[in-house]
Amino acid sequence: MARLPFDNDIKTLRFLAGEMTQGDLGDRVGVTRQTIAAIEQGKYSPSLEVAFRIARVFGKPLEEVFRWAED
């Protein structure tokens, strides 16, 4: 499976937020730990709603969490 055309900083943001676990983030966003892991690894594209919820948890604008990958 090919990686998605965007990157994210979720893992870094989780670490900076007191080493928040994938499960903790999933609970706050309303998705499973497995979904957070897949998003972090670029294997799953979150819905726009989930992307905004993730950004809100960290108090960041969407473009500071997700960005287009450079070729």
Residue ranges and their predicted role:
Residues G23, Q34, E63:
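Residues within helix-turn-helix
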Residues G30-S45:
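Recognition helix of helix-turn-helix/homeodomain-like DNA-binding domains
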Residues M1-P5:
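A detector for short, charged/polar N-terminal pre-domain segments
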Residues R14, E40, A69:
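DNA major-groove recognition helix of helix-turn-helix
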Residues E64-D71:
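Short amphipathic recognition helices of helix-turn-helix/homeodomain-type DNA-binding modules
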Residues D9-R28:
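Short basic helix-loop element that most often maps to the first helix and adjoining turn
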Residues E49-E64:
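DNA major-groove recognition helix of helix-turn-helix/homeodomain DNA-binding modules
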